[in-house]
């Protein structure tokens, strides 16, 4: 809502009348609201208050540039139903309405020419040609075989190239290859022989490597692997010839193979122009064979003589036929064929309209010189062939060709080949007019000229078609131009009528500005403004949005103190929104042009003071807030009024507020708008048009990823002798054959005998296989070795023990006896009685031998009684040496006399 300058009721009634008549010119007014109503009457909408400050920032002076730039606005913004308050325009910003302008008639015309068009695009597809790959595949395998299965300990693979002489004499000459290879590694020449047999000539046979673009031939499909005992090394030499496709992209400085290898040499290399062709190889690695005949190893047929290039890499040799760049490569490719094309001439360009394809290409009027195109020799050839085919099929009997093929370079990098066509009737007029001008008779048989040269340039001077002065032709041309002019004039009249209507509307606006300038300027700007007339110009100021919660409506429209007078519009109290600072608030009201404008400064101060003090006003039309309460009238009986407040209406009866009425309860009349139903364009179905297909985009580049991966997968399978590997079953096949023989010859008995033989053989083979597998296991061999070492050590210890027992049996069997004897000898030395000690020792030994003999007999009896209680002689001897007694509970006899006897213990007095 805005606060606008006050006007008399009569003037406002006239303004409303004009607004209703010219509602389209007065699309909006100062105020908008999105408010509700409740109680008496503090109306507010918290949802709308959030945007109050944002809208308030637009308040200020309006320059003339803003008025011009706001000519195109969004009309939906006028009816947002928000409340605005506007400062009184003081003349700081003035605008004027434009004057009616002169309307020009549309007289532009175009020249259209029909014909056949062929469009070309850049050729992004690589150059594809056939190449042959020669190499020898060397495989060296080292195996180890012990008592079990054989093991591969090392496998070395490499490829070496094949010399030109061998290729010419053997491969392409005889269709065979020698299984010997000589190669240089680190300045050392090595030789390899297949199966370690000196070079043998073998025929080249097809391999598993087969694809639509690749074929391969080799001499062997078995990789040699020896399985004799110990370490063995075997060598395989396979001679391989592969036919594949090579690819190269512009500018054709290198090419790639299906193997993934690239060669840094131009595919158009020739020795005659080798300095102008890219080549990274030394001279001895590139050889040009003149009149070379290559052999197809599949059909065994020699090709016609052709110059052929050979490049010798370390791992392979590549050969391909020499090609002419101008006839083989082309930088352009045909895109579209347009049998019905129209060339429309404009001031600076040609528009080539392809209706069937729903496409138009724009090109310069200057024809393109096709000779400027590098490697563009294919363009005229393809264009002539295509246009000739279309003309012979569709236009041969109805049209003739006018001139030759013209080339135009269109925007976007498209090359257009255009052939102009003229109908036979129009061509006759051309020829008749040319004949009259040259005073020569031309018979009607000239109509057959298109079948020969296909052109109407058959006049004596050769330029007859360029003079178009025939009256008959002019009539025909006028008919065509009339139709074209009628269509163009129809559009021109609409434009002229629109211009005249705008001029007349300007006149109405000049009158409306005298009645209600604020409504007029609001409609023009597209947002709420305040305006007043200053002579022949308008003073304009922007408006401040008032939040709905800052507006308080009063429920009575009677003037206090005078019961006979009432307010014409509802009265209210409002407050300006709080500003961020005083300067920002001053910018929201009409600012004076200079500091000497005291009135403007006072107004800014008043506006700043009104931020915090309520301002008395009245609710104006279209959510306007009028400063003051001066709109009064004598009170009338049966008073009933609806006033727009925000988006809804307030109902007053007898100058008292009754209720709030929703806008949906009041019927809206929209018949003030007159719809114009005009079909501007005909229905058009667009045709999908792609410059490059998916296959073309996928095929871009020197290497084809799918082809390289497929080749590598097939290559890995080519030498793995899958089809020739022998599967051994450890002799079961032979035994099975014997069983079948017995069954077939002896019948049922033979079958039983065969089953017995097969069962026994299977058991034997399983046992032998188990033992062989156990011996072949490295852990089993390690365990056997450890067991042998332990047995040897145990044998040495046993041998030493036996030798010791033989030398000193008593000391070996009874080591404790020696200690007792030594102690006894010490006592005997003290007593000086060695003889007695020796005698006693001998008695003890004899007694021990007797006890040992008895114990041996007892042990034998117990072994017979309980076979499970077994013990070795060593265990018995150990127990005897540790305990000096038997391990049985029944035998409680002492082995020897204990040391408690007085013979072995003496008093101190004996020492």
UniProtKB/Swiss-Prot annotation:
Intervals, Virion surface compartment: 31-778
Signal peptide location: 1-30
Intravirion-side positions: 800-911
One Pfam family this sequence matches: Glycoprot_B_PH2
Region of interest: Hydrophobic membrane proximal region: 722-776
Alphabetic keyword roster: Disulfide bond, Glycoprotein, Host cell membrane, Host endosome, Host Golgi apparatus, Host membrane, Host-virus interaction, Membrane, Signal, Transmembrane, Transmembrane helix, Viral attachment to host cell, Viral envelope protein, Virion, Virus entry into host cell
Cellular localisation: Virion membrane; Host cell membrane; Host endosome membrane; Host Golgi apparatus membrane
Major subcellular location class: virion
Biased composition (Low complexity): 599-610
Region feature (Disordered): 591-610
Residue segments, region Involved in fusion and/or binding to host membrane: 143-149, 228-233
SUPFAM superfamilies: Viral glycoprotein ectodomain-like
A Gene Ontology cellular-component term: host cell plasma membrane
Subunit and partners: Homotrimer; disulfide-linked. Binds to heparan sulfate proteoglycans. Interacts with gH/gL heterodimer.
Family: Belongs to the herpesviridae glycoprotein B family.
Main function: Envelope glycoprotein that forms spikes at the surface of virion envelope. Essential for the initial attachment to heparan sulfate moieties of the host cell surface proteoglycans. Involved in fusion of viral and cellular membranes leading to virus entry into the host cell. Following initial binding to its host receptors, membrane fusion is mediated by the fusion machinery composed at least of gB and the heterodimer gH/gL. May be involved in the fusion between the virion envelope and the outer nuclear membrane during virion egress.
Protein name listed in UniProt: Envelope glycoprotein B
Natural source organism: Psittacid herpesvirus 1 (isolate Amazon parrot/-/97-0001/1997) (PsHV-1)
Gene: gB
